[in-house]
Amino acid sequence: MERNPILAAMGGYPLAEIQMRARDLREAGAPLIDFSIGDPREPTPAFIPEALKDAVPSISQYPTTAGLPELRTAIADYLRRRFGVSIDPATQIIPTAGSKEGIFHTPFAFIEPGAGQGVVYGSPAYPVYERGALFAGAEIDPIPLSGDFVLRASDISDRSWERARLVWSCSPHNPTGSVTSNEDLVDLLERSRSEGALFASDECYVDVYEEDPPGSVLQVAGPDLAGTLAFYSCSKRSGMTGYRSGAIIGDAEAISALIDLRASAGLAPPEFVQAAAVAAWSDDQHAADRRVIFTAKRSVLRKAFEQVGLPVVASTAALYLWVAVGDDVAVTIKLLEQGVVVSPGRAFGPGGEGYIRLALVPTLEECEVAVDVLVECLDE
């Protein structure tokens, strides 16, 4: 059967291929410690599934695309606590079925297919920026990131700015864990506005950090959030990867366009999932508790790489360690053969070659076991 040519050209999702190889090893009986996919092993805080169960109705009804008012209010309250910003829950917030689908579908609301409009993002990058852009009919424009893996307005050429319709930033950054300063966010946002481009800030990991809390574009965009979208998720903050719950916050006109798009596709999280998200966004302590666990894992693994003289680059926030190893494919295969699954940096696009990414998803105990394998394999 013939496939959409875009789908045929891009092949499988990069990390899915790694998972297939790992699955084959598991089926052969090999024990694996898996750092490849950002799906933490810590239990979801008990009050969250309780809220979900309490909200399951006896009669099923379609959810509204705009989402429950209670959820939009809970998200606005969280943003006020976290960033000191005032967001209108009625016009500036829309829930999504996780941030991934929101990120993928956003270009469909703003791109004119085949018109040569550019979607700009730093590379290496979360693969969904590229994939959503291509399926929406945009021209992709990956910008090579410098040594600190932070995208800055000055990194983007005038030619790229001229054709840009959508500009992505990601902070804390996937795959590297770098953090973009508010000053750099201001520069990106102001240039995007001056060029007539929509600025989209992926902030899904903003509550996963070691010391200094990362900022948000919402703090610098002004009360109307003109030309701005920010993307949030319950997945890592609250251990809700399987619930599929996120949100887009931003410019009321852009949110309205997204509601129209999403209504056409029936993209709305179930209301019992939204009820669980209300509980999650209303509580900050569980996010702080999880942060302690991720910091402990990061420390254990960083020491292992330091022991064998391999630099951990950036990696002060988000869920990832980004390690310079030389031949990322060879190292990935070597570790896989020894029972440790990591992601080769090139899976995240140009600029990822020579690095591996480790997601802080195994338990702390598993991380400690993995250290011995890492040291033995990488010290050779």
Ranges and model annotations:
Residues M1-G11:
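Conserved PLP-binding active-site segment in aminotransferase class I/II-type PLP enzymes
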Residues R3, A16-L32, G38-L52, R82-E380:
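PLP-dependent class I/II
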Residues I33-P40, D54-T73, R82:
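A glycine-/small-polar-enriched, mobile loop at the entrance of the PLP active site in fold-type I
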